[in-house]
Amino acid sequence: MYAASREALTQTRAALSSALGSVSAGAATAAAAQIGAELFSVVEILDEQRTLRSALSDTSTPGNVREGLAEQVFGGKVSAETLAVLKAAVGQDWSVTSDLLNSLVLVGRESLLKAAADQGQLDAVEDELFRLGRIVAGNPKLEQSLSDRSVPAKRKRELLSKLLYGKVTAVAEALATQAVGRLKNSAPADAFDELSNLAAAQREAVVAKVRSSAPLSSEQSDRLTATLTRTYGKPVTVHVEVDPELLSGLVVRVGDEVIDGSGAGRLAALRKSLK
């Protein structure tokens, strides 16, 4: 994302904060959830209507004119708070049209995560999205159904919604179903991992992805979390995936850093040293 779009995103986020600040404290959580859901709906419409999205992102047209068009099209169809965020976004000069749409999605996600945080559900949302990624990655048939470009986005969302209904938080379901209908070049599991990481980022936590040769006990998990928290100097979320092929031990990945303490890793290192 170029400088112009980065500044436009900053202004759009500021508009979200302002919109949420304009409602009463008791209504802020519901407003955040509504803004997120409605921004997703707006993007879905813009994805389908090339002429409209081009008009709303045309930098040769004055920003106030683009804002007026947004109000003409979406006024009365979304809340006043959502419309304020949308008008702020289209009034900015974005480097490319895709930056506008992707940023509306991002701000929508952040708004939904704000609602989850207000309800004390942010940790649950993060964990649910991570586990969903692992489930999909381990189910080739489901992964194919969700990633098949010949399947309409609406049908993919309906499929995932049926699978998730009543099993995860409303925010996790909303985030996941939106993402699966707009995968572009991402695999479904990767998209869900990205959402999980975004949830962790909302509470300034580091995500540690751990592969273990066997399930960790609660005590082992707590000890690992405490060790990583001391190492990185900030809260750490530990996501554990069991992988018997490791033979023993753990592989811990934090960002681009990998700590391989597995039996398979030690064997590989030994083989390399003997060459």
UniProtKB/Swiss-Prot annotation:
InterPro entries: ATP_synth_OSCP/delta_N_sf, ATPase_OSCP/d_CS, ATPase_OSCP/dsu
SUPFAM superfamilies, sorted: N-terminal domain of the delta subunit of the F1F0-ATP synthase (SSF47928)
Pfam families for this protein: OSCP
GO cellular component terms, A-Z: plasma membrane; proton-transporting ATP synthase complex
Principal cellular location given in the protein's record: membrane
Residue runs in coiled coils: none
Keywords: ATP synthesis, Cell membrane, CF(1), Hydrogen ion transport, Ion transport, Membrane, Transport
Function: F(1)F(0) ATP synthase produces ATP from ADP in the presence of a proton or sodium gradient. F-type ATPases consist of two structural domains, F(1) containing the extramembraneous catalytic core and F(0) containing the membrane proton channel, linked together by a central stalk and a peripheral stalk. During catalysis, ATP synthesis in the catalytic domain of F(1) is coupled via a rotary mechanism of the central stalk subunits to proton translocation.
Family: Belongs to the ATPase delta chain family.
Identification of the protein by name: ATP synthase subunit delta
Organism annotation: Rhodococcus jostii (strain RHA1)
Gene that produces this protein: atpH
